[in-house]
Amino acid sequence: VYFWLKNPDSAEDKARLKEGLATLRGVQEVQWMVSGEPASTLPRDVVVSDWSVSETMYFASSADQDAYQVHPLHQAFVKNYSHLWSRVVVYDTQVKP
């Protein structure tokens, strides 16, 4: 998930969003989660780096991901922190061996 903050230069807004993301670790179905910011790599035509904060989660199954979507902690995150972002892009990936 990639978030573009309404105020991308605001360290306070970035910290608040990360604080909100940390609450999502309390969702039992989330097996693993990390968040980050754009890497300081050399510019390349294929790199998108204008976003503010990202988070990646792993779930054991699609059913667990579905349960996460309606979980009260996720719903509270959206309600309490969505005012911080102007855009969100989600890339759902199913990993198969």
Where in this protein do the model-derived segments appear?
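Sec/Tat-exported extracytoplasmic proteins
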Residues: D9, R25-Q28, P72, Y81, ...
